[in-house]
Regions:
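Structural alpha/beta surface segment adjacent to cysteine/selenocysteine redox centers
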Residues: 97, 102-192
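Conserved short-loop catalytic and cofactor-binding motifs
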Residues: 89, 141, 154, 175, ...
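A short beta-strand-turn-helix
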Residues: 82-99, 127
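Alpha-helical scaffolding within the catalytic cores
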Residues: 87, 119-121, 220
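C-terminal cap of thioredoxin/glutaredoxin-like
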Residues: 2-59, 190-259
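C-terminal region of N-terminal signal peptides and the immediate post-cleavage residues
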Residues: 52-73
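Extended, low-complexity, charge-balanced
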Residues: 1-2, 93
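Short extracytoplasmic/periplasmic juxtamembrane "stem" segments immediately C-terminal to an N-terminal membrane anchor
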Residues: 67-89
Length: 259
């Protein structure tokens, strides 16, 4: 039986070295693959995160835009009624308009709301917009605390010539009498829906001495003219003003404007 030749020591060392090199190469290749997969995973995770952020931002932006258009009822109606008509303080319409109408109202009075939303837009369109009548708003706050809260913000909005916008939106979003609906959050939301109104400035001014004085003046005028309910209107030319209720307002304006 032939004898199998045994590898020499050198040959065994060379073989062991080759195995070691091959093993190290395999380990290095496996490590490289793991690193590539890890980097790829990180890239994919980062990409997914970016996509998620973009989707969230897009959804948030879309939601914000939608909320700004739809969260406050009456925004479009208010714009349609008042857009383009000059305002100065309490007054809506041209200062040169020959006929003057002073409205006494409480912003949580449901009768004031109903008349303002149902009949006032046509009166404004027919008489105020053409420059025949100028209207002045006087806030009365006799129903309760919500009346006071809303009246103060409305009066503060008048300092920025935005009273009529705020008043109209307040009527569109009016809650039940003395239900506590006129919270700061609600009033801020309404004020924020008025184009061009600096909400922070209005809220800073609502408790000012100037606002208090104007509300007191409105009450004094109402008492002097015998106003017993809201809405009540004074209609006429110059200082000759006649008190009428909502039902009598259209005829009184028509008579004051003349043919």
């Amino acid at each position: 039986m032939p004898t199998v030749a045994q590898p020499s020591r050198k040959e065994r060392r060379d073989a062991a070295r080759r195995e070691r090199v091959e093993r190290e190469a395999a380990l290095a290749a496996a490590g490289a693959r793991r690193r590539r997969l890890s980097r790829l995973g990180a890239v994919l995770a980062a990409a997914a995160a970016i996509v998620a952020v973009l989707v969230a931002v897009s959804a948030s932006g879309s939601g914000t835009k939608t909320a700004s258009r739809t969260a406050v009822a009456g925004t479009s109606q208010t714009a349609a009624t008042l857009s383009g008509i000059p305002q100065h303080g309490l007054t809506l319409g041209s200062a040169k308009a020959p006929v003057r109408v002073i409205e006494f109202a409480d912003l949580q009075c449901p009768f004031c709301r109903d008349y303002s939303l149902s009949s006032m837009p046509q009166l404004i369109r027919d008489y105020v917009r053409p420059g025949k009548v100028r209207m002045e708003f006087r806030s009365l706050a006799f129903i309760g605390p919500d009346s006071v809260s809303a009246a103060r913000v409305a009066q503060a909005a008048a300092q920025q010539n935005k009273l009529w916008n705020f008043v109209d939106l307040a009527y569109h979003n009016q809650g039940k009498e003395n239900s506590g609906w006129a919270t700061d959050a609600v009033l801020r939301r309404l004020a924020g829906a008025v184009p061009g109104l600096d909400v922070n400035r209005a809220f800073a001014a609502r408790d000012s001495a100037a606002v208090t004085a104007q509300l007191n003046a409105a009450n004094a005028l109402a008492n002097a003219k015998g106003v017993q309910s809201t809405p009540t209107f004074l209609v006429g030319r110059g200082s000759s003003l006649k008190a009428v209720d909502a039902a009598g307002l259209p005829a009184a304006i028509k008579a004051a404007v003349g043919p």
